[in-house]
Amino acid sequence: MAEQTPIQGSKLGITIAAMLGALMAVIDISIVNVALSDIRASFGTPLDRIAWVSTGYAMANVTVIPLSGWFQRRFGFRNYYAGSLLMFTLASALCAFAWNLPSLVVFRILQGIGGGAIIPTSQNILFGRYPQKEHGMAGALFALGAITGPLLGPTIGGKLIDVASWHWIFLINVPVGLLAAWVSFISIKESAFKPSRDPIDARGIGLLAVGMVALQYVLEEGNRDGWFEDMRIVFLACTAVICLVTFVVHELETPHPVVDFRVFKNVSYSAATALNFLVGTALFAGSFLFSLFAGTVLRYEALDIGMLFLRGSWIQLLIMPLVGRLVGKVDNRGLIAFGIVGITASLWLNGHLTQLADTHAMTLPIFVRSLGLGFCFVPLSVVALSGLKPSERGSAAGLFNLTRELGGSIGTAWMSTMITNSAHQFRTDLARYADPYNPLFQEQLRVAQGAVARLPDPIQSGYALMASRLDLQALVRAFNTGFLTLAAAFAVSLFLVFLLRKPKGSAAELAAGAH
């Protein structure tokens, strides 16, 4: 199997191309979510179908991520990265001119194919060009770009929709994508690159694609379709299990695997990957719950939610360069443990929010979470790959990033189901106290009827107001339960830290392998 060769060319140009591409791809994931209601209104799409705008992208994204290392060896960094940027840019333009929901979903799938390649490839390009002594700061700078995207996405999306239309959340990618593709093509030099001549593992690629698409569909649509009460979900779940298990067995047996699972023989890597899965669960599922709580309970607009994340996450931008310097100078396991405690604490704080939460109460958990993520992000990657051979790190890095994405998808599906079921159960429990003969209920009912005394039927209006208050209280309790469940699940990840081995070698070398 051909080894990845060092990259030459303009360091500034390569940095600009890598950062622009990564920032664009990461922003696009979050910027679309704030536009779903406008897209739905534009196309007249049913509420249960509009989610395919995000689902189609996610399916393509998770399929391409583990294959990116193979494509890099096959076509080279410059050709693959520039080609992925152009595909992403073209698909963005097509999304803006989509004429109905099916056409938009198809174009989003094309966009996901390009986007799934951009993040891992831009990381490899950046660390392939910088000398080892500069890898620590290069990693911190890249992390800043990757983290800035989710913070800016909702804010930029909300502004564009307010002043123009949803079409511009896609059109804004066109000049950025063209610039990044042009700069990468003229800057990246691979004079010693020789394309891999290994046979194409068509069977492995096919099994992976079918399995990941089926799995992502189940995770995205399962709660909406009643999970295993729907035969389509049952069929696709079985398809995902059969294809992915067969894929793993096939990759372990074939002499030229498209994804090398043998890296899991390394205990430290396996523990770090499991921990990364839980990080993805806590991060994405926690953000999902927080945004949903702010929107449904506190009635925040999408732009207001984006500003909440922006105000609470500035500490992350300051912490990343500091952590980049600490990696290798102190025991990375201590940094990871501190980060886990911070993320767990933020989920615990979220678990005590109420319908009366003010801006300070909403911002504090985001601040604490950002602090924890700042300490966990880079050292976890370094520890994961520190005990692996350089030839193993390509597949290992792809799998490592994929587990975080899968953790987010599974965690979000889990929390979506939990909130629905918990809210119903809490509403049933609270209804037992809505007894007309209960003195406390009678007092609250009189207050409610007094609040609507000027309405035509204050008695019935009072009962309706009490019912809405019970619904709201049940929803708040459901969200609290979801956050606290996530906190408990993520706190368990502290035990995985004991399985991590102290990295050997220079921080620069390890940081290079981590990316």
Name each model feature, range by range:
Residues 10-85, 92, 102-104, 143-145, ...:
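Transmembrane core module of solute transporters
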Residues 137, 142, 148-154, 158, ...:
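Small-residue-rich alpha-helical segments with characteristic i,i+4
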Residues 35, 49, 179, 404-502, ...:
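Hydrophobic transmembrane architecture of multi-pass small-molecule transporters
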Residues 175-193, 210-221, 239-253, 493-501:
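C-terminal membrane-cytosol helix-exit motif in multi-pass small-molecule transporters
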Residues 34, 66-67, 151, 155, ...:
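Residue-level hotspots within transmembrane alpha-helices of multi-pass secondary transporters
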Residues 65-205:
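Helix-loop-helix hairpins in multi-pass membrane proteins, especially solute transporters
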